[in-house]
């Protein structure tokens, strides 16, 4: 009631003509390069004089200190004329339909749009010359439109029953023209409005002395037509290829020249069980390249599946971690026959999965797992559930042992413990939304900086950023940052920017939420404390492109540049995913100091990768033979029992017999063969033939 009273008082002031304007101000720059100002009724706006401001101050006092539209447009306004539509233009049912404080704040701002000196431009365009009778809104800035939709859609029933893209298709400004809000907004959290050049003319003409910071960054659309891209990583081999993961089970290569290879680098879509509904986290989860990938060709993949051998048991699906090796002949394709299963975790639910894989500077593989929404009752009542849930695992994959895929680092906190699995490095996580390793940590006391986004177990509506430290329990451990998200979207972890192009972003941890809001964390060099700051991204008026859609993940290339992966729909089958790169508009896209020499990807050249064909080789270069093979590089076949009468074992349990002998081990004499007196010569020929056949089998 108090808010409505304040608006009525303002309308009364308009009707009685309390405000007097100077028509010359609104007409001053009509012929100049400044943006043409017109109110909704076609008249120029008026300048506020001192007595007008006193009246506004009195109205603010009557409203209990609420800032009215005079606070948004303190110098020039269209609410000073008796024939102005004023605030009543937008006084319909939606502005009193919510008790949500955040939504109310946005509605109060939108109510003041008719008072803007650019109100005619905000409400009328050639494509939209008639106002909608049910919901009369100005043309909103794209990020503001999304913020309004996601904040208010649950509090204004019946009016916003649509998607964010459809809503903003009509109510967001599509061209480079002015959009609402056209006044500086104080941001408690979240990005500032994504416009860089739209306030400049207004401040110059209006005589506003406040300093407006033009420190926004931009996004450059790199690739479109992707299917639910969830991550983008590099191999660290000098080729500067970017490997894009699609949720359905594909990994694609983007070259430094911007070409997307037609043939996928990895295709396991027949193994991957992916979810098609929003909130279903199943699918291809993560990819990490071995630090020595250039020599050993090893990579590690995590995905969800449901194979037959797990068909019986207390689970919905299986989270699996697998080692693959790149093809010996084609460096742009994985040999799927080299798959070695590292880890399998039974999951009951389709959320809180985690599955992030990454290598630390210590060379160990880190696996970040969510709690899978598993309760203590689930753990007690059902056998077969993993003890790894909600944990960070640390494994040593550089092992020469052929019977186990990894070893346990002796520095793991539970190496000799009986209470925790020795693989566990830290635990107490709930819903890790992506983690990243800082490649250049600034704190000399910490040689490993892993930052993760996570939900708060005690209060699921809040989120937190964690710094993963050895042996910590994050059920009780304080987080780096804990806050209530500025929208209802879950957090999506990003990367610590260590690139070259956007120098202003250097050292900042870039992350966001699912609904397209971006934040950064910066560590103070003095206090070592992490401070939260909004990340401002410019709109199309100041940048070559703008961000749209939901954030699915972040990526990092070999130079340390950060990428954003998005999609406007949650269906995995749709090709509307995009890849964006964060760039600084004040610097060239590729400054001279950022240029590096690209090394074309080459096939593996090590002896083990070329000769170990009847087995697999470990990341350290040891050839582990498949059953039935032995010797150096597994080139000697084994026959058990051994071949008799001079027969040669050419394949596992396959003997090539001399003439005159039969049977699996050449143990039988062939009675039908005529004996030849020169048996010695024939035996030599048979021996030579056996050798040639054996050699041919190796070559094949």
Curated annotation (Swiss-Prot):
The entry marks the following residues as binding Zn(2+), namely 383
Q: State the name under which the record lists this protein.
A: Hedgehog-interacting protein
**Domain spans labelled EGF-like:** 607-634, 635-667
**Signal peptide extent:** 1-17
- Decide whether keyword Ribosomal protein is in the record: no
Q: Which domain of life is it from?
A: Eukaryota
* Species this protein is from: Mus musculus (Mouse)
Whom does it interact with, and what assembly results?
A: Interacts with all three hedgehog family members, SHH, IHH and DHH.
Q: Which PANTHER family match?
A: HEDGEHOG-INTERACTING PROTEIN
């Amino acid at each position: 009631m108090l808010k409505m009273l304040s608006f009525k008082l303002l309308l009364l002031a308009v009707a009685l003509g309390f405000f007097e304007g100077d028509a010359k101000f609104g007409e001053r720059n009509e012929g100049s390069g400044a943006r043409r100002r017109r109110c909704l009724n076609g008249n120029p706006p008026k300048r506020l004089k001192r007595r007008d401001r006193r009246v506004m101050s009195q109205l603010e006092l009557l409203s209990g200190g609420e800032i009215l539209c005079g606070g948004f447009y303190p110098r020039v306004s269209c609410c000073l004329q008796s024939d102005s539509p004023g605030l009543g233009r937008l006084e319909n049912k939606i502005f009193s339909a919510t008790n949500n404080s955040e939504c109310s704040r946005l509605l109060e701002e939108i109510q003041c749009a008719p008072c803007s000196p650019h109100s005619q431009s905000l409400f009328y365009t050639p494509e939209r010359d008639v106002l909608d009778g049910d919901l009369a809104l100005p043309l909103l800035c794209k990020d503001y439109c999304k913020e309004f939709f996601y904040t208010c859609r649950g509090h204004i029933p019946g009016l916003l029953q649509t998607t964010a893209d459809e809503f903003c298709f009509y109510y967001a400004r599509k061209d480079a023209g002015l959009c609402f809000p056209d006044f500086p907004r104080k941001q408690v959290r979240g990005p500032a409005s994504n416009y860089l050049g739209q306030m400049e003319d207004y401040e110059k003409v209006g005589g506003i002395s406040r300093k407006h910071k033009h420190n926004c960054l931009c996004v450059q659309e790199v690739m479109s037509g992707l299917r639910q891209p969830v991550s983008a990583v590099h191999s660290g081999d000098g080729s500067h290829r970017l490997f894009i993961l699609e949720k359905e089970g594909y990994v694609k290569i983007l070259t430094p020249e911007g070409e997307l290879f037609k043939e996928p680098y990895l295709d396991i879509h027949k193994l991957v069980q992916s979810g098609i509904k929003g909130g279903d986290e199943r699918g291809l989860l993560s990819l990490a390249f071995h630090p020595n990938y250039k020599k050993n060709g090893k990579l590690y993949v995590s995905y969800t599946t449901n194979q037959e051998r797990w068909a019986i048991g207390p689970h919905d699906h299986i989270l699996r971690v697998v080692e693959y090796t790149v093809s010996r002949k084609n460096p742009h394709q994985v040999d799927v026959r080299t798959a070695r299963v590292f880890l399998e975790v039974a999951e009951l639910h389709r959320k809180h999965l985690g599955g992030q894989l990454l290598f630390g500077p210590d060379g160990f593989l880190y696996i970040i797992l969510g709690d899978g929404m598993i309760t203590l009752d689930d753990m007690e009542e059902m056998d077969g559930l993993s003890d790894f849930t909600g944990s960070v695992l640390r494994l040593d994959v550089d092992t020469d042992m052929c019977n186990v895929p990894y070893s346990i680092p002796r520095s793991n906190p539970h190496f000799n413990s009986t209470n925790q699995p020795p693989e566990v490095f830290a635990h107490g996580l709930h819903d890790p939304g992506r983690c990243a390793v800082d490649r250049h940590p600034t704190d000399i006391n910490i040689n490993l900086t892993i930052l993760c986004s996570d939900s708060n177990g005690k209060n699921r509506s809040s989120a937190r950023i964690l710094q993963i430290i050895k042996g910590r329990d994050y059920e009780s451990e304080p987080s780096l940052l804990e806050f209530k998200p500025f929208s209802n979207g879950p957090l999506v972890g990003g990367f610590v920017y260590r690139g070259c192009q956007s120098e202003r972003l250097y050292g900042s941890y870039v992350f966001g939420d699912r609904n397209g809001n971006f934040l950064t964390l910066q560590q103070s060099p003095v206090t070592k404390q992490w401070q939260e700051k909004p990340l401002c991204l410019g709109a199309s008026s100041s940048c070559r492109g703008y961000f749209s859609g939901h954030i699915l993940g972040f990526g990092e290339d070999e130079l340390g540049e950060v990428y954003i992966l998005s999609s406007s729909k949650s269906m995995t089958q749709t090709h509307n995913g995009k890849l964006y790169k964060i760039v600084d508009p004040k610097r060239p896209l590729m400054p001279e100091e950022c240029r590096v020499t690209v090394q074309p990807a080459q096939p593996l050249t090590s002896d083990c990768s070329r000769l170990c064909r009847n087995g697999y080789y470990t990341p350290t270069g040891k050839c582990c033979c498949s059953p039935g093979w032995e010797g150096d590089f597994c080139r000697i076949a084994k026959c058990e029992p051994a071949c008799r009468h001079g027969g040669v074992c050419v394949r596992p349990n396959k003997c090539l017999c001399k003439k005159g002998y039969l049977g699996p081990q050449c143990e039988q004499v062939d009675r039908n063969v005529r004996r030849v007196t020169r048996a010695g010569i024939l035996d030599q020929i048979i021996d030579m033939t056996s050798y040639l056949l054996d050699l041919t089998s190796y070559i094949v």
